Amino acid sequence: MKKFLCLSLCIALLLAVLPSAAYAVETFTTSEEGIAFIKEFEDYRATPYEDNGKWYIGYGTLCEKGDYPNGISQDEAERLMRECVKVAEDLVNNLLLTYGIAVTQYQFDAMVDMAYNLGTQWMNPTYRFCSYLISGVGQYTEAQVVNAIATWCHQG
């Protein structure tokens, strides 16, 4: 599921990539379309489940194995997801502002989704995908960007 999601992110980023100069650097919040995207691909699970040795609940929110023994409602699942998305938003916004990276709402949503699903390790400037963002994705071929993102798709 995470590989499919990451492939979707690759497509989203590639379709939306425009020269950075076309946009002002600003802070964003995830759009309702971005939230719906996460919910659709994560799917709701009322009880904790294991995936790759980690435990999750609701819409893919990280938890501990013993958390939520009685499960959670969809409303609670969405609240938990939005709390985690807010953390991801702050981290992505910090990256963008620190390096003066201008993006579209669509690109921001994709990066928040990537941080939510795969973690934030990809935000390290020494890693290819982050270094491409910093120096301008437009300087690289689509194949190079896809390969840089694909590295992280195999992490989750």
Q: What is each stretch, according to the model?
A:
Residues 87-126:
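Active-site nucleophile-His-acid catalytic modules used for acyl/amide transfer and hydrolysis
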Residues 25-52, 61, 65-68, 72-89, ...:
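Long, amphipathic alpha-helical surface segments
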Residues 1-4:
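Positively charged n-region of N-terminal signal peptides that target proteins for export
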